[in-house]
Regions:
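Glycine- and charge-rich intrinsically disordered segments
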Residues: 1-79
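A short acidic, Gly/Pro-enriched loop at the edge of an enzyme's catalytic core
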Residues: 242-252
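Conserved Class I SAM-dependent methyltransferase catalytic core
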Residues: 175, 215-219, 271-329, 337
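Conserved SAM-binding strand-loop segment of SAM-dependent methyltransferases
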Residues: 230-239
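Class I S-adenosyl-L-methionine
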Residues: 57-63, 67-228
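A short SAM/SAH-binding and catalytic strip from SAM-dependent methyltransferases
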Residues: 252-261
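Local beta-strand N-terminus motif with an aromatic residue
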Residues: 186, 247-248, 318
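Short glycine-enriched, charge-decorated loop/helix-capping segments at active-site entrances
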Residues: 265-270
Length: 339
């Protein structure tokens, strides 16, 4: 398939799929049968990652003005971005947060070299030990986080350890490949749970005339995303705080999943868990004929209650379903999930 054109020559992964499950429509509250395929990604031999560039350190003078968004959107060219052990990820996060706060204090927009540093922030999925005062091996990291983050930032970071599944470049490429096969080329693109914006960073060349809109609840991730993608319209807040009905041509991303709900007055009556809420709202945000391409929990299809599936089927046509490998998020988010 066609993938993001990269600045460096790197071997392209082999992406194939095979049917693994069939959900009969008459047993699942659907007007049609659903065939789920399993995605196989055969990665080329990895090349050693380049060391992170040193960040230019701006002056520390206080400046309450917002940074001028005059930079260029960042482009991800590292297929192994976000991989590594817990200590490596922790240090990359800390380095990115320190740089973010320096840029904000100086009222500056990140340079391309600084964007490289910020892009290595992977969030706190799989790093719960750093927030646990009862873990002696992580005592210094615990103290460092308490000192570096505001109470609001700390609370958001700690809560994200359970549901922050940052998406690997390989999975993002496969999703864009599928969207491209559907005929999408350019338009208004929404990423409603963007993290630091890896889907924006891997936008294929043929889609680069699109207008980008992102939403991110976590304050640190959202502010890093603004530094990485200054030409995008990014809201740092919950998806429930935004509403652009019938505006987007494509909604894409890796939505949160879990057994809890979002307080959105327009959707509370549905009583949907968070991952299904994102589907329901996104369908209203895209225009008729638009596409929603999300990574979601397998329970969207596997749940015994067919209410969600019937709701979605009444409002949209399912174009395809892919089951990702169990370890699709292991290298980046430190988690094994079925999605």
């Amino acid at each position: 398939g066609l993938f993001t054109r990269q600045e460096k020559e790197t071997p392209a992964p082999e992406i194939t799929s095979e049917p693994v499950t069939v959900y009969p429509g008459d047993k699942n509250g659907l007007p049609y049968d659903v065939v789920v395929e399993r995605l196989h990604i055969d990665e080329p031999e990895p090349t050693p990652p380049e060391p992170a560039p040193s960040a230019e350190r701006p002056d520390h003078q206080e400046n309450t003005e917002q940074p001028r968004r005059t930079g260029q959107n960042f482009r991800i060219t590292d297929d192994h971005l976000g991989e590594g052990g817990p200590r490596l990820k922790y240090q990359a996060n800390i380095t990115a947060i320190r740089l973010l706060k320096e840029l904000e204090a100086a009222g500056q927009q990140a340079s391309p070299e600084q964007q490289e540093v910020l892009s290595r922030y992977v969030g706190w999925g799989g790093l719960s030990d750093a927030f646990d005062p009862e873990k002696p091996a992580w005592a210094s990291e615990y103290a460092q986080l308490k000192e570096l983050l505001t109470p609001e930032e700390y609370a958001a970071a700690r809560s994200s350890t359970l549901n922050a599944h940052y998406t690997s470049p390989m999975v993002i490429k496969a999703i864009y490949d599928a969207v491209g096969r559907m005929g999408f080329e350019t338009g208004n693109i929404l990423e409603p749970s963007m993290g630091v914006g890896n889907f924006f960073g891997m936008l294929p060349e043929k889609m680069r005339n699109s207008r980008l809109y992102g939403v991110e609840l976590d304050p640190v991730s959202g502010r890093i995303a603004k530094q990485l993608y200054p030409k995008a319209d990014i809201t740092v807040g919950g998806f429930e705080t935004t509403d652009r009905r019938d505006f987007f041509d494509l909604a894409i991303g890796n939505v949160p999943f879990g057994q809890y709900q979002v307080n959105d007055k327009a959707y509370n009556k549905l009583n949907f868990n968070i991952h299904n809420y994102f589907f329901a709202k996104a369908l209203n945000q895209v225009r008729p004929g638009g596409v929603v391409a999300f990574v979601t929990s397998r329970y969207t299809m596997d749940a015994k209650d067919s209410t969600v599936r019937r709701y979605l089927a009444q409002r949209a046509e399912l174009l395809g379903a892919i089951r990702l490998p169990n370890d699709a998020f292991k290298k980046n988010a430190g988690a094994e999930v079925v999605s």
